[in-house]
Amino acid sequence: MAIIRSKRYRAAIEKVDGKKSYPLAEAITLLKSLPPAKFDQTVTLSFRLGVDPRQSDQMVRGTCPLPHGSGKTVRVLVFATGVAATAAREAGAEYVGFEDLIKKCQEGFQDFDVAIATPAAMSEVRKLGKVLGPRGLMPNPKTGTVTEDTAKAVKEVKAGRVEFKLDKNGNVAVPVGKFSFETAALSENGAAVIEAVVKARPSTAKGAFIENVTLSATMLPGMRVDPTPFLKA
């Protein structure tokens, strides 16, 4: 069945050269010149990586603080007690607790975007693997969401730190902001994301790590981005 595209989408795709790899700043300028949607679209960088997602030693995962934030309101849940719990509340976490929150999550509570836990809390939080795991919400030391410094973690997430993880097809997609952002802000966020993904290259990866990069917005066509300036010699 053929996909029916909107008039706006068809007009946008005529402006994009599908054979060209654009410098990041040029790609963002072009994206911003395309017809906007009726809502503030999320702008995303998608990476096709030269790794085998079936191999555990080729997993690509990490975090990236966006210099200009993500434009998204992030709801944070923290599993902690005592001083760490108090610090999380003062830093702005929406939900803070321990056994009460574990029970609440087991009962189906899902009104949060990021979960953080202290190392001491993880022995119990691991019981939520089947609940939080499928949604990508299980706290993990590699993404800075298992930590004693709950205040720092909450502030970083609220400020726009994004997480990324390789999917089963060897792709990584990372939001870099909103369509309403200034071009310079999107460019700086995008550069930070590309650099973070490059640094996350597994030591076991062979050959070209970043095979291609695509910039897109929710309702607009993607365009290829040249990652060469961000690659180490």
What are these model-derived regions, one by one?
Residues 3-17:
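Generic N-terminal amphipathic, Lys/Arg-enriched alpha-helix
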Residues 4, 225-233:
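Short, charged, intrinsically disordered terminal tails
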Residues 22-86, 107, 113:
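Translation machinery proteins
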Residues 27, 88, 133, 215:
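Residue-level signature of catalytic and energy-coupling elements of molecular machines
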Residues 39-43, 200-212:
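Flexible, glycine/charged-enriched surface loops at secondary-structure junctions
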Residues 47, 80, 118-119, 176-178, ...:
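Flexible glycine-/small-residue-rich
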Residues 93-200:
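Long, charge-patterned amphipathic alpha-helical coiled-coil/hairpin "stalk" segments used as oligomerization
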